[in-house]
């Protein structure tokens, strides 16, 4: 029987969350993502304005989960992820709560295992297209975990992380792409970004996001430089 990808966060996964594979619904078909309708599409704020690593086109929700970048380290990579909390459900404040250490373990049976995690991403793009920033781009967010890019391990130190609210099993929204592409261009104007990649590409076999449904060709057509080897 096919297995369902189910987000399982493990404290041993330094600076990140791990994704294990199993079927949580024995004897049933894989669970389909719960779809909560997104608000009407909104045009994201189009800006290249940054202040101390904070993008002025985002809602700012500071997280305590970050580390200073090593002296002399430059930001050269953007890593795309997906996340949904509770798993396969959209909307609500759980992702923001996770990244700010305010997750309520009583709110959902899945949440107790998240309470002691200290993870974050620089940005979250919600299904509506709302962009939320948690960590200054000048600092290292705790998003990539055990990872490697072009022979360099520990991608947190030289990357920016963007979480897209979603999962591996359905497309992202039009509003998310409308927000993501201007954000990527703004990042490239502010930082010496060399390429954009996925978590699945820097942690193969351990991670699968942003997943099969992410539209890499759309990014390439918009002039975003993708990491070598990304074709779809």
Predicted regions located by residue number:
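N-terminal catalytic cores of peptidoglycan-degrading enzymes
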Residues: 12, 37, 41-153
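Basic/polar, cationic surfaces and motifs that engage anionic cell-wall
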Residues: 47-56, 68-72, 153-160, 167-232
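Conserved beta-strand segments that form the floor/walls of ligand-binding pockets within enzyme
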Residues: 124, 161-163
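Short hydrophobic targeting helices and cationic amphipathic motifs
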Residues: 7, 14-15, 20, 26
């Amino acid at each position: 029987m096919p297995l369902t990808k189910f987000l399982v966060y493990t404290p041993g996964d330094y600076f990140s969350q791990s994704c294990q594979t199993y079927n949580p619904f024995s004897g049933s078909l894989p669970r389909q993502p719960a779809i909560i309708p997104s608000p009407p599409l909104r045009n994201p704020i189009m800006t290249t304005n940054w202040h101390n690593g904070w993008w002025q086109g985002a809602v700012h929700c500071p997280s305590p989960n970050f580390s200073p970048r090593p002296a002399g380290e430059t930001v050269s990579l953007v890593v795309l992820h997906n996340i949904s909390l509770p798993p396969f459900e959209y909307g609500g404040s759980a992702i923001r709560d996770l990244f700010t250490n305010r997750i309520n373990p009583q709110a959902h049976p899945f949440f107790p295992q998240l309470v002691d995690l200290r993870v974050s991403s620089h940005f979250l793009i919600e299904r509506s297209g709302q962009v939320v920033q948690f960590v200054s781009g000048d600092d290292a967010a705790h998003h990539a975990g055990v990872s490697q890019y072009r022979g360099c391990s520990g991608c947190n130190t030289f990357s920016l992380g963007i979480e897209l609210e979603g999962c591996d099993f359905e497309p992202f929204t039009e509003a998310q792409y409308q927000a993501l592409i201007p954000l990527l261009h703004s990042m490239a104007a502010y930082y010496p970004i060399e390429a954009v990649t996925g978590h699945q590409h820097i942690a193969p076999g351990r991670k699968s996001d942003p997943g099969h449904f992410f539209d890499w060709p759309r990014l390439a057509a918009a002039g975003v430089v993708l990491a070598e080897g990304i074709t779809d």
